[in-house]
Amino acid sequence: MARWDYKKDIDYNAIDMQKVRGDSFLFQLLTIASFIEITSDTYAKNLSEYYDDNPKAVQWLQEDWEKEEIQHGEALKRYVLHVWPEFPWQKAYERFLELYLPLCNTGSFQPTRGLEMLARMIVETGTSTMYRAFEDYAKSLDEPVLAGLTHYIYKDEVNHYSYFDRYFKYYNQSENLGRKEILQVIVQRLKEASSEDIEMGFQSIYEIQNDAVFDRSSYELFKKELNKLAKKHYPYSMAIKMTMQPLNLNKTLETTMVPVIRGAMKVLGI
Ligand SMILES: [Fe+2]
Ligand SMILES: [Fe+2]
């Protein structure tokens, strides 16, 4: 079970509206994150099917991971609706589901259970570092409620990473994955992390707010803002450390790999 409860632990009435209400980029970021997080039940179901050999993993996925991810979505949704109550969240979310659900199937899973655990580690690296950046951004805006909320989420994501790491190691005892295979999955997941779901979230907001066909150039502007945020607030060294951990490298190799991973992240726009 989640170690915090957004209904009790987040005081939405204490939000400093002046600091955030005019920030449309922040609105987009938090709304997109709420859409993706709140849809975690679909992933939990697919993952539980994939790991039906492992009742302990399934229990953790259903009783902890899924509940915590959905809580992230609910907590962010409430923040968005508190600050921007005129936004038809539900309507935009329904559009998001139309675009996003066809992508959520076990067909996109890795070929082995160990490699899929590894892919989940990369996803959790993405979320951990993203919420760490959001927390830092919220602090720079001097909005303590958002800083507190994103800190809670950040802690959960790091915890998810360590669970998936544990299961990755468990499966790797029998799968004996080589570094090349591991690196391939890392790079592949890094590519995916930077794209589709965020763009679909953006598209749904755009369509509902403008009542118009999606204009890709507005997404390019959003990405520019995202890059600006990353430059100031993204914890790159934490991301690199978490990304490289499954490679289990010695110190010399690790030093060699840092610029490779950093370079890959740059190319991918992370
Ligand atoms: Fe989450
Ligand atoms: Fe997570």
Model feature map: region roles:
Residues M1-I270:
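Non-heme di-metal
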